[in-house]
Regions:
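C-terminal motif of bacterial Sec signal peptides marking the signal peptidase cleavage site
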Residues: 21-24
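Bacterial N-terminal signal peptides that target proteins for export
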Residues: 2-14
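Short linear sequence elements within intrinsically disordered, low-complexity coil regions
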Residues: 14-15, 326
Length: 388
């Protein structure tokens, strides 16, 4: 068995102020403005590695025996309190695993694919960068790092890092339709993972030695950027590199706002934290509405509400957190009107409940058309309902 060390984990050349990351360097307290700026940039560059590792610990409980196994696998849609990942999807079934390839390959299988609903394998490296998105997976995929194994089941997929995440999504058209849920669960049940048992958990500690002021400034910049830049521009997709194709700050801000975000070609996410006037969305201010035409997508679309303070789903009595293209009630002209308020009442159509404090609305577009990918089509921001 290979030793799980930082040297094994970080073979990729990642330039930092401390040089190539093969071990956790210990930054000294900044002594000048230039030193401070360099350390903030260093922190920002390392954040996605550490955040990915923290999710690996969260999903496995720090138990290496849970690597190469599903750490999240619910046959029902996630509810408030079950959403481990910040801004988790509530429009698909999830299966998530963290894999370690130091002891050999891992095989993914999709034994019961469906042509009638969207499903995918989203593969991410140790940096929260997408290295492969498999749409409508069918059959087997052998994931390996380094030398290609002599025996490959199905398609061989080279993984750029020893530690990697596998996120699967299966579309649910209507959670209240028993037949539809059964169809989604059939695809879910057919998705398997097989790999060696790991006996030692990797240890990644890249941020703990930074000065508190450095960390605070880095997070301030990430939060500030996340509020003004479209989420899709903060995602590193297949064939892209952080720092080259996506600025480090964008990559880290996107990781913090929603770790596990897929590449735009898979699904584009549009997060709205403000109303049409630029003011922060707050449930205590009253009701908001969005009137929109159907987004141009090949698969499906949805809108979901989150508590901006926690980044999690907001609890409600009906466990209703999203509306999608199947469940949305349309206006006569084909558009849809969505309402966001503290308490949805009988007779309210396309209504989602929000917290009294800040909230955000995330629109997800699965297999988006070019107009979404190039920014020519965007969903309108919520408008505050004026009281008579």
């Amino acid at each position: 068995m290979k030793t799980l060390t930082m040297k094994n984990l970080y073979r990729a050349l990642v330039l930092t102020t401390c040089g190539i990351i093969i071990t956790a360097c210990s930054p000294e307290n900044p002594t000048s403005k230039d030193d401070f700026e360099k350390q903030v940039e260093d922190y920002i560059q390392k954040f996605p590695y550490q955040n990915t590792y923290e999710y690996a610990i969260l999903f496995t409980g720090g138990d290496p025996g849970k690597l190469n196994k599903w750490g999240q696998a619910s046959r029902d849609l996630l509810k408030a309190g079950e959403d481990t990942i910040v801004r988790s999807n509530n429009d698909t079934l999830y299966k998530t695993a963290f894999i370690y390839l130091g002891d050999g390959p891992v095989v993914l299988r999709s034994d019961a694919p469906s042509q009638e609903r969207f499903s995918s394998f989203q593969l991410q490296d140790e940096r929260n960068a997408n290295y492969r998105n498999i749409i409508g997976p069918a059959g087997s995929y052998t994931l390996y790092h380094g030398e290609k194994p002599g025996t490959v089941t199905g398609e061989a997929v080279e993984v750029p890092s020893l530690l990697s995440a596998v996120v699967t999504r299966i579309e649910v058209k209507d959670k209240d339709d028993a037949a539809d849920m059964a169809g989604a669960q059939a695809v879910f049940d057919g998705i398997k993972i097989e790999g060696p048992t790991i006996s030692e958990m990797p240890v990644v500690d890249l941020l703990s030695d930074f000065d508190e002021q450095v960390a605070q400034e880095a997070h301030r910049r990430m939060d500030e950027l996340a509020g003004v830049v479209p989420f899709s521009r903060m995602i590193v997709g297949p064939g892209q590199e952080p720092g080259k194709d996506v600025p480090y700050l964008y990559h880290s801000a996107g990781t913090k706002e929603g770790w596990g975000g897929p590449a735009t070609a898979h699904s584009a996410y549009e997060a709205m934290f403000t109303d049409e006037s630029g003011a922060t969305l707050k449930g205590s201010k009253g009701e908001y509405v969005v009137v929109t035409e159907a987004p141009p997508v090949k698969a499906f679309w949805s809108i979901t509400v989150y508590d901006s303070t926690t980044g999690r789903l907001h609890p409600n009595d009906d466990d209703r957190y999203h509306i999608n293209n199947t469940t949305a009630v349309k206006n006569e002209d084909g558009s849809s009107t969505f309402r966001f308020k503290l308490k949805c009442e009988d007779g309210d159509v396309n209504c989602l409940e929000v917290p009294a404090g800040p909230f955000d609305v995330v629109a997800r577009y699965y297999l988006p058309e070019p107009e979404i990918m190039n920014g020519k089509w965007e969903m309108p921001h919520p408008a505050k309902v004026k009281n008579d």
